[in-house]
């Protein structure tokens, strides 16, 4: 699908009247000048086919589909976040509570930081080992060198560790990919150019990923991709997962699963993710995917109007609540706060509570700093995949990735873009950037502070 919209934008060949496309491409959509600015379309050419009841203020993801110019380029159709997932029934067991406290000195509960997540992973894999006659693991992930490995990292893993700067929906001047912007102009990904793609927090995040995958996850996880790994926690032998997409909620709440009670309620719960050692208040804390209606210039006018009408129908208040209850990918505040969602909440494992909490606002998609998502996405899985397989050291892989990102920025600078064309910074000594008080930051002396946990209710209070 990305190739289709990319082809239509780059060549002008009309393939489809509309797309549902990830808002991760917002920076590219804005800069190409080929995607319809919906703000102007709704009061101009599309005014007669724009619903008076559309109520854009009711959409929770509008800031994610808005360009640096304040104009709307995509209309959200579905959203899901990546959160922390854990077996609440196991965490609540008095025998496991006591054993954990005896070993680690604090309560087995929702982890506040990565140190606690690591302790809990070790606890279940190394110390508990078996529950009810079955081998159990304290961590689940996937490590196959495959395109889906890319979004495992580009979907805010660096910012969860603490890379980048403060700011919502994305850090400024350095975002969760480690790309620095000045104004709206991307100027570098490598630390030598003021970026953070190969900085200390990025290296820490990849090293932790590899360490946990090798030590605490099922052995087969290393050869799994996103699709293969997604269903594994439902089999009942995983204690927690730090990076779990809420899009799996519907599949994980089916009756007769090992992780579902007889009354249909889940044995598990989702909660806001723990934060890495480099994280500081004000930095985003996770990723939220937004699939959004996108119109491309050059589409025949009548086709575009028909497509816009249909797009609005699919997200209208008449439809969206039912769609949310079935797909569990909410887009409207009114749906989230509805009586129907309150009634559904006990069987959804914390989904409703998360989306009603202030914590939700710290989970955001890839932002406008990324000028060409289709070209830049592959560098993630190819380089980090090589590090996971031990083919190159982590720092070397990240250095190469940052250099490749800089090369893409340089190429875009040479070609030019419709708006906010990249302009690569000169390489400077690291001390120059460290003294600015923004990302990149120096390596911490201690990357494993004491583990800290909290009650579920407190985790929602960001």
Question: Which functions belong to the PLM regions below?
Answer:
Residues 1-4, 112-116, 220-235:
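Short helix-initiation/N-cap motifs at beta->coil->alpha
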Residues 204-208, 301-314, 376, 397-400:
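Short amphipathic alpha-helical coupling segments at ligand-binding clamshell hinges
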Residues 265-275, 325-388, 418-448, 455-457, ...:
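Long, aromatic- and glycine/proline-rich binding clefts that accommodate carbohydrate-like moieties
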Residues 21-25, 226, 243-249, 272-274, ...:
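Beta->alpha turn/N-cap motifs
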Residues 23-83, 267-273, 445-460:
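Hinge/lid segment of periplasmic solute-binding proteins
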Residues 116-122, 160-223, 269, 273:
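Glycine-centered hinge/linker elements that transmit conformational signals in sensory
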Residues 66-71, 214-219, 228, 238, ...:
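Extracytoplasmic/periplasmic substrate-recognition and gating elements
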Residues 1-58, 93-95, 99, 239-240, ...:
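Extracytoplasmic "Venus flytrap"/periplasmic binding protein-like
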């Amino acid at each position: 699908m990305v190739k289709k919209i990319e082809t239509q934008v780059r060549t002008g060949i009309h393939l489809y009247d509309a797309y549902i496309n990830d808002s991760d491409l917002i920076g590219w959509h804005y800069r190409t000048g080929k995607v319809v600015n919906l703000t102007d379309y709704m009061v101009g050419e599309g005014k007669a086919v724009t619903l008076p009841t559309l109520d854009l203020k009711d959409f929770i993801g509008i800031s994610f589909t808005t360009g640096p110019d304040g104009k709307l380029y995509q209309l959200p159709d579905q959203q899901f976040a990546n959160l922390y997932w854990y077996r609440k029934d196991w965490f609540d067991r008095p025998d496991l509570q006591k054993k954990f406290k005896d070993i680690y000195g604090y309560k087995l509960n929702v982890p506040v930081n990565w140190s606690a997540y690591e302790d809990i992973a070790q606890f279940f894999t190394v110390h508990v080992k078996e529950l009810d006659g079955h081998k159990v693991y304290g961590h689940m992930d996937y490590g196959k060198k495959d395109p889906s490995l890319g979004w495992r990292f580009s979907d805010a893993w660096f910012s969860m560790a603490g890379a980048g700067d403060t700011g919502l929906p994305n850090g400024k001047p350095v975002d969760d990919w480690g790309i620095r912007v000045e104004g709206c102009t991307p100027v570098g990904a490598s630390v030598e150019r003021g970026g953070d793609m190969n900085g200390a927090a990025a290296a820490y995040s990849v090293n932790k990923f590899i360490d946990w995958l090798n030590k605490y996850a099922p052995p087969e996880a290393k050869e799994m991709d996103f699709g293969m790994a997604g269903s594994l926690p439902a089999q009942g032998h995983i204690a927690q997962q730090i990076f779990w997409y809420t899009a799996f909620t519907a599949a994980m709440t089916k009756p007769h699963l090992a992780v579902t009670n007889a009354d249909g309620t889940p044995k598990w719960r989702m909660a806001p993710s723990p934060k890495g050692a480099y994280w500081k208040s004000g930095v985003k804390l996770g990723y939220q995917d937004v699939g959004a209606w996108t119109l491309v210039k050059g589409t025949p006018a009548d086709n575009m109007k028909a497509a816009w009408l249909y797009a609005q129908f699919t997200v209208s208040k008449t439809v969206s609540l039912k769609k949310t209850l079935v797909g569990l990918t909410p887009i409207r505040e009114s749906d989230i706060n509805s009586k129907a969602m309150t009634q559904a909440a006990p069987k959804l494992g914390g989904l409703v509570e998360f989306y009603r909490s202030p914590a939700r606002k710290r989970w955001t998609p890839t932002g406008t700093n990324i000028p060409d998502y289709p070209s830049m996405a592959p560098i993630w899985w190819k380089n980090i995949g090589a590090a996971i397989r031990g083919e190159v050291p982590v720092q070397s892989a990240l250095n190469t990735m940052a250099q490749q990102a800089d090369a893409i920025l340089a190429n875009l600078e040479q070609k030019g873009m419709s708006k906010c064309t990249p302009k690569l910074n000169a390489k400077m000594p690291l001390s120059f950037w460290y003294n600015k008080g923004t990302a990149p930051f120096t390596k911490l002396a201690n990357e494993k502070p004491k583990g800290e946990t909290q009650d579920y209710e407190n985790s929602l209070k960001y």
